[in-house]
């Protein structure tokens, strides 16, 4: 964890999200939630020249999530990324009350998790009400679905919260175009737009140096008003890589182990093991990762990692 934190910060990441995806939700069952968050915070504080944004993953029913929010707040985390997966089947009023309770403890980053991996279907009215919660500062949009992505944007706009809430893409299948798209902000013929400003992505737990460079390039292109064709082409290339790393062919079975495999190949992890022994690479996933590594060498940061690995592991 210490070496990964150092890698992410030296690669230029603006912040770290701890307790989600590759950190594994299972740390909670293993009694590792607080120790992992504490180690990541201490590592980031000791290593970074400028303090990064630190976000803690929050999960479970209300009592557990509130407790996790208190732990994260006391450790100095800036915000909590709120998973609603444990509230499947709950009424919208219950979901909003849950979010309000957690928001009283720590600033919130909303999280639209794709249903394929346990997320709930959350319509526009939910996102409008969620965006009205004053201590919501951002939303990670990750339904892996164009229509549902628009639902989040529309809900934030209808709540009048577009200037207060920062939107992040979590759509690992559509990273580049999410960041390039001017989303409509109302019924004025699309003259006013809302933009997704950054990424909070499992895919960006690997090849981080290249991800940072890509984000900077996208921001520069948006500012200039000129989007080159080769930048648009990167969307499909990044998505192809993500299909391998997230094990889409096996319905995301190896979604964590695939990220671990990239980090293992670079020497940042000793293996691909997960706390849940069922979390392994899927059938054929290793070969798919081989394929995309060979097809898109410009998307990896292997040379950067090689040059710094010994220092990070010290």
Where are these regions (language model features)?
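Active-site beta->alpha loop and helix N-cap motifs at the rims of alpha/beta catalytic domains
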Residues: 1-127, 278, 302-313
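A non-catalytic, amphipathic alpha-helix used as a structural packing/dimerization or gating element
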Residues: 3-7, 35, 39, 230-244, ...
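Residue-level recognition of short, well-ordered coil/turn positions
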Residues: 13, 77, 135, 161, ...
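Generic alpha-helical structural context detector
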Residues: 42, 213, 260-264
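Structural alpha-beta junctions
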Residues: 44-47, 158-165, 222, 270, ...
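Catalytic alpha/beta core domains of metabolic enzymes, predominantly
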Residues: 101-104, 114-255
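C-terminal extensions of enzymes
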Residues: 242-314
């Amino acid at each position: 964890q210490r070496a990964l934190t150092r890698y992410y910060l030296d690669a230029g990441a603006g912040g770290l999200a701890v307790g989600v995806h590759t950190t594994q939700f299972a740390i909670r069952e293993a009694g590792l939630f607080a120790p992992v968050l504490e180690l990541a915070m201490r590592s980031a504080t000791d290593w970074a020249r400028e303090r990064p944004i630190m976000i803690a993953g929050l999960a479970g029913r209300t009592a557990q999530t509130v407790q996790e929010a208190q732990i994260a707040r006391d450790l100095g985390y800036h915000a909590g990324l709120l998973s609603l997966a444990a509230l499947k089947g709950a009424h919208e009023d219950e979901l909003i009350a849950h979010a309000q309770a957690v928001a009283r403890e720590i600033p919130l980053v909303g999280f639209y998790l794709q249903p394929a991996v346990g997320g709930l279907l959350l319509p526009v009215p939910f996102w409008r009400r969620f965006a009205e919660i004053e201590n919501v500062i951002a939303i990670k949009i990750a339904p892996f679905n164009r229509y549902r992505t628009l639902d989040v944007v529309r809900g934030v706009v209808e709540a009048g919260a577009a200037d207060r809430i920062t939107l992040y893409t979590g759509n690992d299948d559509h990273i580049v175009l999410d960041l390039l798209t001017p989303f409509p902000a109302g019924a004025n013929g699309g003259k006013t737009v809302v933009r997704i400003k950054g990424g909070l992505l499992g895919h960006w737990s690997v090849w981080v140096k290249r991800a940072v460079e890509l984000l900077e390039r996208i921001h520069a292109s948006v500012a200039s008003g000129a989007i080159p064709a080769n930048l648009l082409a990167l969307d499909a290339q990044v998505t192809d890589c993500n299909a391998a790393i997230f094990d889409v062919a096996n319905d995301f079975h190896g979604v964590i182990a695939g990220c671990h495999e990239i980090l293992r190949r670079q020497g940042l992890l000793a293996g691909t093991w997960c706390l849940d022994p069922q979390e392994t690479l899927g059938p054929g996933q290793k070969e798919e990762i081989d394929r995309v590594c060979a097809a898109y060498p410009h998307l990896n940061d292997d040379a950067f990692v090689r040059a710094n690995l010994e220092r990070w592991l010290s």
